Each structure stands twice: as C-alpha cells, then as structure tokens.
Amino acid sequence: MLWKLLLRSQSCRLCSFRKMRSPPKYRPFLACFTYTTDRQSSKENTRTVEKLYKCSVDIRKIRRLKGWVLLEDETYVEEIANILQELGADETAVANILERCPEAIVCRPTAVNTQRKLWQLVCKNEEELIKLIEQFPESFFTIKDQENQKLNVQFFQELGLKNVVISRLLTAASNVFHNPVEKNKQMVRILQESYLNVGGSEANMKVWLLKLLSQNPFILLNSPTAIKETLEFLQEQGFTSFEILQLLSKLKGFLFQLCPRSIQNSISFSKNAFKCTDHDLKQLVLKCPALLYYSVPVLEERMQGLLREGISIAQIRETPMVLELTPQIVQYRIRKLNSLGYRIKDGHLANLNGSKKEFEANFGKIQAKKVRPLFNPVAPLNVEE
C-alpha cells in the first residue's frame, strides 16, 4: 500500500510540474517531505523542518536517523546553529553536525553553552573544540550529569592525565565522565593498591596508572569486587606476585576485564594445545599475555590459521606472540616474505611477528640482504701496477 501511495504522489508531482510555465527560482519547501507519508509529515513541527531546511540540512537523513526530533514541540535549531557558528563552524559543518546528531536541536542552549565551557577546559582553543564536535557530535550533545563531568575532568587533570588524553576520553568513553566522581576515585585507589600489593613501586605505579587510563578508561566502569577476584584467581593458578606484576605491566587494565572463568578456559585450551606443564604454560603466558586475554574461539581460529600455513606447534610455542595476529595479517605477511624466497615454515617466526612498523622494518632488512651486491661497485679497486 505504501509504495502505491508513493507512486501516486510522484506521478501527481510530475503532472503538476509539466503544467508549470517556468521552473521556480528556489526549491519548494514541500520538497523536503519526500519519502514520507502525509500522516507522518502532518505530525512534524513545520517550523523545525523549515529552520533545518534554511540551515541546508538534509531532512531525509534526519527522518531516517532520528525522526522523532521533528515531532518535538520545542526545538532550538537557530540557537544551536549560532553556538556552532560562534565556535567557527561554517554552514556546511553546521549542517553535517545536525544531520549526524539531530537530537542536538532539542538541547537547551544554556546547557549547550555549559557543555561548551566544560570541553574548553581540555581544548587549547575554539578551533580544536569545533573539530572535536564535528568528529564526535553525539558525545558533545549528550547533555547530562554536567557537574559530574566537570568534577571528573578536574580529577583526571589532578591525576596527571594530559588534556589531549582527557579530550579523547570525553569523546570515546563519555560514560566514564557520567560516573559519580567518588566512584572513579574509589576505582583509582583500588587499582593503585592492587599494583602496590603485587610488588610495584610508587614511581612505576603512577606511570602504569596513567597509561592504563589512557588506553583502557572503561576499567573505571568495573566493580572493585571483579578486580580482586581476578587477582586472587591468578594467585590460585600459581602465578607469583612478581609474575602478576609483569602481566599488569603488559596488559594494563585489560587484565581486569577478564573473569576467572574465561581465564580458566583460555589456560585449559593453551595447555592442551601446546601439551605443556603448568610451569611451561606460565612462561608462555608471560611471553604472550594474549593467551589469557583472547577467548578460546579466537585462539583456536588463529592457531588453525597458522597450522594451515605450514607452521608447526613447536614454532608457535617458541614465538607465541604470533597469536596476537589475525589470520588475515598472517596470510598477508607470509605472502610478502614468500615473494623474497623466505620460507617461514622452515625458519623462525620472529620475522612474521610484531607490529606493522616492526614487520615492515624486518621485511626491509631481508629485502636489502636479498638485493645487496657481492661487492661495492663504487669502491676503488686495488690494482697492482
């Protein structure tokens, strides 16, 4: 039925267009109602739609994304657009922001100005602020718990986090800032105590904590009980305080995202796959903490991918860090090494392992050895007269 109505409206529009003697100078206002039923458009706030249209906003995108904002009686299109323009956004940027985050128009201007001042605490200038808003409009226009947000920003600054890191957390981990500041302080204290209890020093603890929060701020959404249970379980598995400290240093807060059950499953899988003793398994885990972090299905997929490439269990055991690579990355790197005549299954996996930058550096060295001339063609020859 809907497609018939749409077809009929399109044909009527075409007939009326043919009757026109000359095309209109401006796009008709009713054109913004394309692809909507008469019933839906009759409920929309026409003043809101008209103001959005004046801002060059694609109304169809808003209808698809958050059509409910067009039904609201009270909206602030002009006010929000003015605030964005004051920060340096041009007409195109304003339109893009409103299209990506339509709920911005139902935010009260006073609350948006408060949010603006809050984010300016960690932005060098308005140019940097508007760039952040353009990239993450949803985070900026999540207007709630502003007092909590402000207190948390100040708390993270006192801890020593740089403003550039805090601004990144505001956009990527906004839930952390909606936490009561006392809860975040409690979690930070527990993290500090956990690090010190396994033998970490005060000086190293501060560096570790700042890296942890910048890499995995969601740790603050955990419960204190979960952190204690994870550490106690590792101790029950025979890990010493020093070994747990090593895991904390490598995995940062990701260790606390693991529950005892998932750790147990990963340990059992690795022990069975490598056919090793408890002591040997601990050494493997310390070399490659991913054996704890990744789930059994992920480890199994990566192990099978390596075996299909002709790599043996013994090679994987010697360089377990290769399990941090996805099967796709492994295949790509093996093809590149094969192009130089390097047979990975007959050699060491060190050249396959590492970050993208490390792999490219190793590949470059192998390539240089491959094409290096046997003698230096520009060196003078010692010729006896």
Swiss-Prot record:
GO terms for molecular function: DNA binding; double-stranded DNA binding. GO terms for cellular component: mitochondrial nucleoid. Signal peptide: none annotated. GO terms for biological process: regulation of DNA-templated transcription; termination of mitochondrial transcription. Keywords: Mitochondrion, Mitochondrion nucleoid, Transcription, Transcription regulation, Transit peptide. It comes from the Eukaryota. The keyword Transcription applies. Residues 1-35 form a transit peptide. It is found in: Mitochondrion matrix, Mitochondrion nucleoid. InterPro entries: MTERF, MTERF_sf. Belongs to the mTERF family. Monomer. Binds mitochondrial DNA and plays a role in the regulation of transcription of mitochondrial mRNA and rRNA species. This is Transcription termination factor 2, mitochondrial. The gene is MTERF2.
